[in-house]
Amino acid sequence: MANTAWLAFQKGDIASIGIDVSIASEYVNSSRAVFTGDDFVGSMQLQSNVEALKAREGENEDKEILGYVDFRKAISLAMNRDSYCATCTTASKAGFGLFNGMHYYDVENGGVYRNEDVAKQVLCEVYGVNVADYESLDAAYAAITGYNPELAKTLVTSAYAQAKADGVIDDDDKVTLVVGTAADTESTRRTYEFIKAALEAMVVGTPLEGRMVVKFDASFGDNWANDFRAGAYDICTGGWSGAAWDPGYFLLAYLSPQYMYSQAWDTSAETLAYDPDGEGTEYEELEMSLIDWYNCLNGASGAAYNWAEGQVENDFRLGIIAQLEKAVLLKYYSVPLYNYFSAQLRSFKIEYGSNTYNTFMGYGGIRYITYNYDDAAWEKVKESFDYKA
C-alpha cells in the first residue's frame, strides 16, 4: 500500500485514511481504527438467462447447469462467507440477506428490519436452521453461517443428474463459468481466486469432480453490470445500496427488470401465496405475482391494494417484506456474501464527537471534532506515532 495518501497519513499530514485489505491484519486492532457500517450488501450474482448461457457454450462445455436451482443453491452453500470477508474485504461481515442492520423500516423509532423476528425467521428458513433446535429464535439466527459444503455436494449431484436426464450435459462436458469484472486489479483477482477455489472444492466427490473450469474476464469495463444483465457472462459480484430508510421500496432492486441483475427471471410470472394479516379476518390467503405484491406494498398506481407506509401497520408491511426477501433468496440468482463495513485509521491529532456511528449523524461531523494538538505542537510529534498499536 505504498501510495501517496498512505505516506502522507503516516507523516501526519492528513486526518484519516482507509485501511486496505492488503494491510488489514496489521492495523485492524489499532486503537485508532474506526469501523463504519453501510447499507450496501455485496452479493454474488448468478446468470439467469439460460438461452444466453447455451449460446456461449463451446465444444464439450456446459453452462446451462447454472439454470438449475439446486446448482445455484449449491454455490451459495459452498461459500464460506466468514472466510470471504477475511480474504477479500478489510472489515466487512458475513451477510445472508438482502438487508443488513442499516435498513430502517421505522425511522422515527429506530426500527431496523433485520432485527425483527420475521426477518430473522426468514433467514433461518432459507439457510436450513431449525429454530426448534435452539433455545430461542435469536440463538438460531446467530447460528447461521450459510456454509454447508456437504449439502452443496449433494445438490451438485442432484442438479447434474437432472441436467443429464434433460440432455443438457454429457459425461465428457466440463462446466465452464466465467467470472466477469470491470478491470483486472488486485482486488478483483482476489475475489476471483476465492470464487474459483470454492467452486472447485464444491465439486470434489461429485460427478463433476475435475470438470469445473472457472475463468476470469476483466474486459467489461464500465458496462460490466449491463453486460451481465444481457447475458454476456456467468458470474459477477455486485450489490445495492440506497433506500436504507425504506426496505419495502428497496426490494425494487431485486424484483424490477429495470434494476435486477437476474433480468431473465420474470417476477410477473412468479407467484406468492400469503395471508398478510395472519390470523386477522380482513384478508384470506392471497396469491399474486411477486411484482404485484411489491406494487401493493408500495401503493403503486393501479395496484390491487394500497399497503404503503402509513396506510397499514408496520407489522403488516414487515411480513410482506420478509416473504418477498425469502422468495428472492430461494431463487439463488443473488447470493448475499457480505454486509459492507469500511475501515479507517484516525490520526492521533483528532477525536470524533462520538466513537459510535449513527446512521443519521455519522460520528458527529466536523462541528464536533476536537483536537489533541494545535498545529505547532503537531508538527513536532506527528511522525512519532505507531498506528499499529
Could you describe each region identified by the protein language model?
Residues 1-3, 8, 126-242, 342:
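Ligand/substrate-recognition segments at binding pockets and active sites
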Residues 1-56, 82, 86-87, 93:
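Extracellular/periplasmic solute-recognition and catalytic clefts
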Residues 3-7, 11, 25, 69, ...:
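Solvent-exposed, polar/charged alpha-helical surfaces in well-ordered, non-transmembrane soluble domains
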Residues 5, 56-66, 71-74, 137-145, ...:
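Second-shell loop/turn segments in exported
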Residues 5-7, 25-29, 44, 54-57, ...:
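Extracytoplasmic/secreted cell-surface and envelope-processing proteins
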Residues 12-15, 70-73, 80-82, 173-176, ...:
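Loop/turn elements at helix/coil->beta-strand transitions in domains of secreted/extracellular proteins
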Residues 39-71, 87, 338-341, 349:
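A bilobed periplasmic-binding-protein/Venus flytrap-type ligand-binding module shared by bacterial periplasmic
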Residues 76-125, 183-197, 228-389:
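Detector for C-terminal structural segments
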